[in-house]
Amino acid sequence: MSIKLIAGNWKMNTSLEEANQLIDEIIKNLEDGDLSAEKKVAIIPPFPFIDLVLNKIKTIPNFYVGAQDCSPFDNGAYTGDVSAKMLKSLGVEYCIIGHSERRLHHQETNLTLSEKVEQALNNDIRPIFCCGENLEIREANQHIEFILKQLYDGLFFLPKEKIVKTIIAYEPI
C-alpha cells in the first residue's frame, strides 16, 4: 500500500500570532476533509513554532510535524544549529534536507547534505531529500545527470534499509 505525504513548508514566514491562526485554519480544513490512513500531512513550520504546532496536532491521526533543516552534527559548539536529536526530542517526524534555497544561500554541499541525512536517520527522523535543477541546466539537457549526482552524493552511501526510509522530493528551481 502506497501512503501519500502532503508536506507544507512554511519557510521563514509568520509571527507567533500568525502561526497560531494558520495552524488552527489548517486543522479545521483537515477535519472537514478526508485524512485517511493512506494519507499523511506534515506541517513544516519555522523552528520557533515547532512546539506550538506539535501541541496543537498531537491528537490528530496521520498529522505530523517536520523541521526545515537539521545540523550535520550530533552536538557541540555549533551556534545556531539544531541537531536531529533535539528535533526528535520535541517529536519531529520529518526533516527537509537539501532544499534549493539552503543549497543556494547557505552553500550546502552534497557531502554536508549526506551528513544531515545520516543524522536524521540515526535519530529516527524521516528525511525529505530535495533534488532538482535550475532552468539553465534543464535547457542544456543536463538535468538527468545533475539530479543523479545529487542523489548519488546525498543518499547512495546509505544501506538499503535506510534509503527506503528517505522521501525524495523533486523540486525544479
Region roles according to the model:
Residues M1-I173:
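Active-site loop-to-helix "anion-binding N-cap" substructures in soluble metabolic enzymes
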